[in-house]
Amino acid sequence: MTPTIKPLVLLILDGWGYREDAPDNAIAKANTPVMDRLWEKYPHCLVDGSGGAVGLPDGQMGNSEVGHVNLGAGRIVYQDFTRISKAISDRSFFSNTILCDALKKAKAAKGAVHIMGLLSAGGVHSHEDHLVAMIEMAVEQGAEDVYLHAFLDGRDTPPKSALPSIERFEALFARLGKGRFATLSGRFFAMDRDKRWERIEQSYKAVYHGLSGVTSANATDAVENAYERGETDEFVTPVVIGQPAPIANGDSVFFMNFRADRAREMTQAFVDKDFDGFDRGSRADISEFVMLTQYADTLEAPSAFPPEPLNNVLGEWLAKHDKTQLRISETEKYAHVTFFFSGGREQEFEGEKRVLIPSPKVKTYDLQPEMSSEQLTDELVAAIESQAFDVVICNYPNGDMVGHTGNFDAAVKACEAVDHSVGRVVSALEAVGGECLITADHGNAEQMSDATTGQAHTAHTNELVPFIYVGRPAKARNGRLSDVAPTILHLIGMEQPDEMTGTSLMTLEQD
């Protein structure tokens, strides 16, 4: 009979990949006595969080949304990126009812088509191939005025990598004989997810009203001028390109990001009737606003690729069996341990509690690499000591959020802060007879420089991630993120649902 283990805690160390020691490996260079001891002492293995193992195209780096969906689902979940790319390749994208209807409405109203999204080959929040397809579709269906509002990456891509993408789209516009860049914004402004409305406001006013203190004759000059100001792609101040092209009556707007978390705030500014984040100014009577995917079920706008339901994810299965669960993280990864881990569900399951620890209000997290880890750990330790929960899901964002800054020394400090927190959590669990699983959703901090470009490496990696079981004697096997939920169920003595096709990474010696 399986002994009662309460709680079982899953610690997700965001961006903590496994890589042999290298000069730019912030994790290896950090002083991490706790993780080093746990790796040596307890059953451990490596799991795959990228490419086909998580439902992405082969070779595509993993990301936090994809990672948490797979962690919670217990099966490989084919991602929106893959789904949309397939629709483009089989041409079903070009007959998508939602997209076609919005284009027809704009044409009937003699309105323009505005396409906005992250101009990136990173494949984390968007892919520029999808923007190309949307522009081609708009022109094919008779749109006369097509405007591209491009958000620049430099986070999931090298910090200064926008110019080749801009050249690609300028060539596309020339080939089609229609379309142009209307605005550029660094994703720092256009894709905030922490209610820093002053950032969204700057990008929104450029896109919606054609207003900015920075203008440029063309997109290439805009980027080169930004570089001269010391701005990398992510931080490019919103720029109006050429003659302003504000949103006007009858226009249709298409938001081409497929990942929800960093698309919600800009979408709220466009569509929420009671929006109060900032003064939006005058509002046009637009024909349609289309989300590529559903960014939130509370947003009143159609989505071209609505969610495909996931049944019997870990949270739902625990609730069906009267188990209690806690989801806890900082602001930056709160959506990941709740919405994404629950397969796209906004509301709590029966017996689920959620705790949000505010992330520090700093421009970039290399300025405070420990982030809010101490406060997060205080809350987590208190929850463990209460013994009120059967399962706890916690994310420490530091490795990823600081890794994205490209600041090596800060990433080292981030890893050390997380290591200290893990030590506190494990000690609290030992005191109450609980157990712990430690893993990551994808890599990041283990590679901080790009050998090809010589620039800082700010993106995720394709590296495997560690998996440690701090508990009973067991044998470990390598696997993928979708094996984690079945592992949790196995360790607490529950059968897994038929929908979960993953298998436990641990075999208890008593089994």
Swiss-Prot record:
Binding site for Mn(2+) 1: D400, H404, H460
Pfam families, A to Z: iPGM_N, Metalloenzyme
GO biological process entries: glucose catabolic process; glycolytic process
Highest taxon listed in the record's lineage: Bacteria
Residue positions binding Mn(2+) 2: D14, S64, D441, H442
Enzyme class, first EC level, given as a word: isomerase
Cofactor detail note: Binds 2 manganese ions per subunit.
Keyword field: Glycolysis, Isomerase, Manganese, Metal-binding
Cofactor: Mn(2+)
Pathway stated in the Swiss-Prot or TrEMBL entry: Carbohydrate degradation; glycolysis; pyruvate from D-glyceraldehyde 3-phosphate: step 3/5
Substrates-to-products reaction catalysed: (2R)-2-phosphoglycerate = (2R)-3-phosphoglycerate
GO molecular function, one term: phosphoglycerate mutase activity
Entry EC number(s): 5.4.2.12
PANTHER family linked: 2,3-BISPHOSPHOGLYCERATE-INDEPENDENT PHOSPHOGLYCERATE MUTASE
Main function: Catalyzes the interconversion of 2-phosphoglycerate and 3-phosphoglycerate.
Family membership noted in the UniProt record: Belongs to the BPG-independent phosphoglycerate mutase family.
UniProt protein name: 2,3-bisphosphoglycerate-independent phosphoglycerate mutase
Originating species: Idiomarina loihiensis (strain ATCC BAA-735 / DSM 15497 / L2-TR)
Name of the gene encoding the protein in the UniProt record: gpmI
